[in-house]
């Protein structure tokens, strides 16, 4: 493939933007390819190269790059009426009502502008509600670019994971391993009276996709109940993608006190939201004393796109389609890995998928969950499948970025550029896209 124009755009970008990108995850070696437009389940770059797109904007694009007619009409109608008003609109009430009808944890909701803003606000809300400071997070989990959760280490030895965050911030954050009930019990035994909340993704979706072992979320729910702490599910990625309109919390049968949203809830436009029990959410100003505000919050175009997107999913076979393609991809990649790289682990659920380049092969190379790792203790791979962020970090992460991703790109398949970010199917993808992708996997694995 020719990437001459992308190279030139990157050189220009480097002169006016740090690293040549506006989000560090978009930086790739030797340089990013610049997208000119989307077309269904594909993107076309500045040099005219076409790719099957499984990145889907890192999750927001449930419908790919061609929005259904009702969604397009809703967006255009609100754009034509004026960009924004600095006052409430009916569409934000309607969108809130739809979410509250379908998501088990949501009685009340506050819309904001990004997933990061949602999790920042949720942490502040939990502290304000409980009068406590400490937040339990998962090692390897990700909750946006916020000071309270950009922390690594362990309880008692936590430190910021980036420059620019005071060490004192980490004193209030307690990182524990995902899928380790004993670690959760220990941190509550030692700090329970000071813990405002447990903040957890139902599925670790920024760490190669790690699903919970049986009973893990129930353990967190019980511990929070026993210590009057809040259980906060970060469903920025899984919301309205895993578990359909009920989100991942309905799939796992565990109801948090507070849920954060982003991505799909805005129909492809910038968005975030914090939902939960009314008595908790109403502690946000002006109803309560926990400050939260934003110029663009509840933006009418975003609200229209989000509401119309979810309504279309409720009335059509959207989830059946994307989940079927997701399973077909995972099954196909599993078959390829069994033949060519039995040490690799295929992960994902519903419309999410990823291959983790784990290093330890099982004794029986045919032993695997065909539709993606389900943390099944009866599976012969159970002990080698990643259970937490540290397990994924021990994989051959460098090979993904330097070799595998490059090869897939040259074969016209756009995947997330590192081992940790997950990939997504959309309503615009086809069986042919799946077959083309599996053929590329056979060459690249």
Curated annotation (Swiss-Prot):
One GO molecular-function entry: transaminase activity
Domain of life from the UniProt record: Archaea
Keywords: Cytoplasm, Isomerase, Porphyrin biosynthesis, Pyridoxal phosphate
InterPro entries, alphabetized: 4pyrrol_synth_GluAld_NH2Trfase (IPR004639), Aminotrans_3 (IPR005814), Aminotrans_3_PPA_site (IPR049704), PyrdxlP-dep_Trfase (IPR015424), PyrdxlP-dep_Trfase_major (IPR015421), PyrdxlP-dep_Trfase_small (IPR015422)
Location in or out of the cell: Cytoplasm
N6-(pyridoxal phosphate)lysine sites (modified residues): 263
EC number, UniProt record: 5.4.3.8
Pathway: Porphyrin-containing compound metabolism; protoporphyrin-IX biosynthesis; 5-aminolevulinate from L-glutamyl-tRNA(Glu): step 2/2
Catalysed conversion reaction: (S)-4-amino-5-oxopentanoate = 5-aminolevulinate
Keyword hit for Cytoplasm: yes
Cofactor dependence: pyridoxal 5'-phosphate
Pfam families in the record: Aminotran_3 (PF00202)
Entry annotated with the keyword Cytoplasm: yes
BP GO terms, sorted: protoporphyrinogen IX biosynthetic process
One GO cellular component term noted in the UniProt record for this chain: cytoplasm
Record-stated family: Belongs to the class-III pyridoxal-phosphate-dependent aminotransferase family. HemL subfamily.
PANTHER family linked: GLUTAMATE-1-SEMIALDEHYDE 2,1-AMINOMUTASE, GLUTAMATE-1-SEMIALDEHYDE 2,1-AMINOMUTASE 1, CHLOROPLASTIC-RELATED
NCBIfam families documented for this protein: PRK00062.1
Identification of the protein by name: Glutamate-1-semialdehyde 2,1-aminomutase
Native species: Halorubrum lacusprofundi (strain ATCC 49239 / DSM 5036 / JCM 8891 / ACAM 34)
Source species taxonomy: Archaea, Methanobacteriati, Methanobacteriota, Stenosarchaea group, Halobacteria
């Amino acid at each position: 493939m020719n990437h001459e124009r992308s190279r030139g755009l990157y050189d220009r970008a480097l002169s006016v933007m740090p690293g040549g990108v506006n989000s560090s995850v978009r930086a790739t070696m030797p340089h990013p390819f610049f997208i000119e437009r989307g077309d269904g389940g594909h993107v076309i770059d500045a040099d005219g190269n076409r790719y099957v797109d499984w990145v889907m904007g890192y999750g927001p694009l449930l419908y790919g790059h061609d929005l259904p007619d009702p969604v397009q009409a809703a967006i255009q109608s609100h754009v034509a009426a004026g960009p924004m008003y600095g006052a409430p609109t009916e569409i934000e009430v309607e969108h809130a009502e739809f979410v509250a009808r379908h998501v088990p944890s949501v009685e009340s909701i506050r819309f904001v502008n990004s997933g990061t803003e949602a999790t920042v606000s949720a942490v502040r809300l939990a502290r304000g509600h409980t009068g406590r400071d400490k937040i339990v997070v998962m090692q390897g989990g990700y909750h946006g670019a916020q000071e309270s959760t950009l922390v690594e280490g362990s309880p008692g030895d936590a430190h910021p994971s980036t420059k620019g965050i005071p060490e004192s911030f980490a004193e209030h954050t307690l990182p524990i391993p995902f899928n380790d009930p004993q670690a959760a019990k220990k941190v509550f035994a030692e700090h329970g009276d000071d813990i405002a909340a447990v903040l957890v993704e139902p599925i670790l979706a920024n760490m190669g996709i790690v699903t919970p072992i049986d009973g893990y979320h129930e353990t967190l729910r019980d511990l929070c109940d026993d210590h009057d702490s809040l259980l906060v599910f970060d469903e920025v990625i899984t919301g309205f993608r895993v578990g359909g309109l009920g989100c991942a919390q309905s799939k796992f049968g565990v109801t948090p006190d507070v849920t954060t949203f982003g991505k799909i809830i805005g129909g492809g436009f910038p968005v975030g939201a914090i939902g939960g029990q009314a008595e908790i959410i109403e502690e946000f100003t002006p109803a309560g004393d926990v400050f939260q505000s934003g110029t663009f919050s509840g933006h009418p175009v975003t609200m229209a796109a989000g509401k119309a997107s979810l309504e279309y999913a409720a009335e059509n076979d959207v989830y059946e389609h994307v989940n079927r393609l997701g399973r077909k991809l995972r099954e196909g990649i599993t078959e390829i890995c069994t033949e060519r790289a039995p040490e690799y682990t295929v992960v994902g659920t519903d419309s999410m998928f990823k291959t983790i380049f784990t290093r330890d092969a099982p004794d029986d190379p045919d032993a695997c969950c065909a539709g993606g790792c389900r943390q099944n203790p009866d599976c012969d791979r159970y002990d080698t499948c990643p259970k937490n962020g540290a397990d994924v970090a021990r994989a051959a992460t460098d090979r993904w970025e330097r070799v595998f991703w490059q090869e897939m790109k040259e074969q016209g398949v756009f995947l997330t550029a590192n081992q940790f970010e997950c990939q997504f199917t959309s309503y615009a993808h086809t069986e042919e896209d799946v077959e083309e992708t599996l053929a590329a996997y056979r060459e690249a694995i």
